[in-house]
Every structure is written in structure tokens, then in C-alpha cells.
Amino acid sequence: MDPKRASGGATGDNQYMTFTMGPALLFCPADRPERYQKAAERSDAVILDLEDAVAPAAKKRARGAILAQLGSGGETAELDPSRTIVRVNPVGTPDFEKDLHCLAHTPYRTVMLAKAETGEQLKALEGYHVIALCETAIGIVNAAEIAQAPNVVGLMWGAEDLIASMGGTSSRKDDGGYRAVATHSRSTVLLAAKAAGKEAIDSVYVDIPDLAGLAAESADAVASGFGAKACIHPNQVAVVREAYAPSPEAVAGARELLEAAAAAGTGVFQYKGKMVDGPILKHAESTLLRARLS
């Protein structure tokens, strides 16, 4: 199956979509097909993982599971391609080519490339909508180059793989906050994505029981400009969604501010004792956009 002609892929000069999945993306091991539908139902998009979530000896079985559910029903029914992402193994590994061969026989055209490190690597995924996962030192340093690839629709960063690639032991300090290098990498990926007009996806929160910590990190992701956040457990989805859905008070305040701006008819004006200009109005517009999407 030609990726450019398959379901979910556009054709012509502008064949690559704008990434709109989210805000809660849920990983699901590809070798657990009985979980596919549940993961899809509980999230905004499911990530079928052929990489880290699958043991080397089970990768062949995982690819077979993806193919086997096509056209089937029940708990292993075929997933909606517009809400499905497949994470493939890194370019240059034996499993990468096998993953592509599998994908060519499916309708799934949004791919997450594990350990993306250069823009050149993205040529191997021409015709696919790619989320480039920057999770090595090289990938972070080259994030801006990677984001410029035409088929890249978004960047995500991976904290634990990044630290491991540098010989470290943990991305977080004892208080739960990120170490400086992780914070720098998170910001680097966010800026690279937004500068290229692509979406940015925040890394997973690995402390599954700590929903309060996840809520705080998700709120920061929203405020910073990340368009989505990845999850590793269904219980995390509601927390991420709540963070991205503005409160009724925030929506009302944003509407009032934009109405006041329209009435003022000037570039800069005072509103409730504060000076308001273009960037502040964009914040209000972003709040209303998130309200419509939630």
C-alpha cells in the first residue's frame, strides 16, 4: 500500500496534515491487541508501541497483532486511523524496516519515530505524518533541524531515554522536579517545534500513582504551549484532559477581554488596571480554542 494513497494521507503539494490529536495520547504495547480498543476509548489518540514497550523477542508478534486486527471486530476491532499513532523502532535498526513493511499494509499513516536524531532520517518516512521523538543528546541538539522536515507534524521529547543516552541515572531530582538538563531539553524541543509551525508533545509522567504531580506538570505544559501530553496509564488521561480544558471562569474572562479589545479599537489598552496588548489577546484566543476542543 502506497503511504501517499492510503487512508489518512493527503495528496498533492500539501500532503502533510496539521497534527490535531490530543491532548491526551495513550501508549499501548503493540503486542497486547486485547488492549487496543480500551486504550483508544479512554484517550484522545492511542499510540501502538512497537519500540520500548515490546521485548525484542516479541516484536514480530507485535507487528502481526497490528495486521491481525485489521477488519476484525470486538475488543480487537480495527482502530480509527485519524486517532491512531504507531511508534516505530529507530532508523537504522533491523526492526525499523520490518515496522515499515507492516505499516504499508495498514491504514495507519501517523508514525512516531523513536530516537529521531537528524532531519535526514525523516526521508525514510516520506508519505507518513511523523511525530519525531527527540530522546537522545543528538536528537535534542538537532531538534530544530528535525522539525523542519516536511513530513514532521510534531516533536515530542523523552526524558528517561535522554538521560540514559548521556550515562545519567534519573531525569528528576529528589523533589520530583526535572534536572536542569531535562528542563533545557524540554524547552529546546518546544521552541524547535513552534518555530517550525509544528506541534509539541510533552513527555510522559512515569510516577503513575502521583496524579497531583501529573496535574501540576500538565498545567505547566498547557501554560508553556505544548499541544498534547503523552500518557502511560489510562488513569492519567482524565488528569491531562482536565489540565487542557480551561475553567468556565477562564473562558468567561477570555471572552470579556476580547470583547473589551474590540470595543477599545486600539493596539494597546488598559483592562482592569492592567496594560493589554497583542500577546495577551493571543493568550485569550488560545484559551477559547482549548475550550472548543475540550
PLM regions and their residue ranges:
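N-terminal amphipathic/basic-hydrophobic helices that include classical n-h-c signal peptides
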Residues: M1-Y16
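Expand to "…catalyze enediolate/carbanion chemistry for C-C bond making/breaking, isomerization
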Residues: D13-S294
